[in-house]
Curated annotation (Swiss-Prot):
Belongs to the VMA21 family. Its main location: endoplasmic reticulum. A motif (Prevents secretion from ER) lies at residues 74-77. This is Vacuolar ATPase assembly integral membrane protein VMA21. HAMAP family: VMA21. Keywords: Cytoplasmic vesicle, Endoplasmic reticulum, Membrane, Transmembrane, Transmembrane helix. InterPro entries: Vma21. It comes from Kluyveromyces lactis (strain ATCC 8585 / CBS 2359 / DSM 70799 / NBRC 1267 / NRRL Y-1140 / WM37) (Yeast).
């Protein structure tokens, strides 16, 4: 059974997938250039990965609530 997935959902997923890979790696290596402490670089890279994950969850909840409002509007008509 094929499921029709909106393009906006795929675009958001691809954006956050790339951000989850690229942002922590860039953070790690940028901090390695500016500090000699690997613990700080690794810790902040992990923090960046968590920030991307939190942003994705927030976007998912907002999308879910907006689709619920659209469904309620359609039911009222």
């Amino acid at each position: 059974m094929p499921v029709d997935v909106p393009r906006s959902v795929i675009a958001k997923l691809m954006f956050f997938t790339v951000a989850m890979v690229v942002l922590p790696v860039l953070t790690f290596f940028w901090l390695q250039e500016h500090t000699d402490n690997t613990l700080v670089s690794g810790g902040l890279a992990a923090a960046m990965a968590n920030l991307v994950l939190i942003a994705y969850v927030i976007m998912a909840f907002q999308e879910d609530s907006s689709s619920s409002e659209d469904d309620e509007t359609k039911k009222e008509k």
